[in-house]
Each structure stands twice: as structure tokens, then as C-alpha cells.
Amino acid sequence: MSVPGIVPEFARIAPDVKLGRDVTIHGLVNLYGCEIGDGTMIGAFVEIQKKARIGRRCKVSSHSFICEGVVIDDECFIGHHVVFINDRYPAAVNPDGSPQTAADWQVIGTRVERRASIGSGTVVLCGVTIGEGAIVGAGSVVTHDVPPRTVVAGNPARALRRLPA
């Protein structure tokens, strides 16, 4: 597969990945079963899992992890080291002590709406929606929905102010 900005031996892009036009992917990425929209840039050391969808003209900065069930709409910014979580109660073993497998958990989706911006080092827990045009400050832990055009920050992230329409 030929993609601008990639040295193939340093990137793992599975055959089931759907890449839009003019996507730029920097080396040392792991992409499988995902969809990436036109004009989006994916930084180095990023993993995007199956059934995740990234919209058009987004920027996903280096070292970020976008797991199954995450939908990022058009024109969003994802800072460095942003982590999305898709399992509300992660565990290594079941109550009986047997190792957990993929069949033992339920994926809970997350949505990032158009033109939202997520600062570096943020953790986004499952089941939340980050509203259109919202800004999440660096290092935040997002545990609840973020309303559109709202600036949030902290652990847990709290609303700091509303942005003009």
C-alpha cells in the first residue's frame, strides 16, 4: 500500500483499513479495521483499532491510542498521548479466575463531534460525547459528556467556560 509519508517497513497498515484521499500517515503506526477520512494526518506511534472512524481533515498527533468504538467527526484535533478507553470495567480475569478474552467484555463507544479539540495527555473514558467545537485541556480525564463549544479541563474534567457560537 502506498501512502504519502510512510516508509512501509515501519508502519503496520492492515488490508482492511479504509483510507481517504490525501491522508498523511507517519511511520511506526498500527492501523487495522479502521476508517480514516480525506485529508487527515496521523502522527507516528499511533494505534487505531478496528471499527474506529476518523473523519475528514483531522489531525491525530503522535503516541495516541484510538480504540474500537471511537468515532471522531470531521476537522478534529487529537493531541499527543491521547488515550481513549472503551471498557467500563477492565479486568485481567473473570470472577472465576479464568483469563478474560474478547468475549468477556462489551465495547462502549465514544464520539468526538466536529471541530472538537483534545489536548495532549488526555484520557477519554468510554460512553462520552465531546460536543462540537469543544476544547479539552491537556492532561484532562474526561468522565462525562462535554457540551458543544465548552472548554473543560482537570481530573475529572470540569467546564471552565462556554465559547461563542
Q: What do the PLM-derived regions correspond to, one by one?
A:
Residues 2-15, 25-126, 155-156, 161-164:
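Flexible, glycine/small-residue-enriched loop-and-beta-strand segment within the central core
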Residues 128-145, 149-151:
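C-terminal/domain-terminus segments
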